[in-house]
């Protein structure tokens, strides 16, 4: 779950299964989005989904809401292991889990990464706050 008011490093990519441009705010979210796009069991991907009718929904968004090929929805939140037990992270994950359970979605999970990858790998389109992405902007 992310705070939509936070301005941070942004990676953009067009995924085949996402109807809009995919925005990732860290390397874990970016890599997992690509993995979902390549997964034959996933039919559709929505990223950074607003929590409608949730008091925190104006500011926080779920990382991934997907529709599987069997028609069932799936929700995933991306978290780095070192942030997993921080009180705010726990609070946001609980909000997300309870929100989606209230909508009848039981396939809710957390994607955990041991480490943060360097963003300096070639081929990742990067835009910084206040900067628009352009294909020539690779770090």
Model-identified regions with their sequence ranges:
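Electrostatic, structured charged patches in enzyme active sites and in nucleic-acid/phosphate-binding
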Residues: 1-139
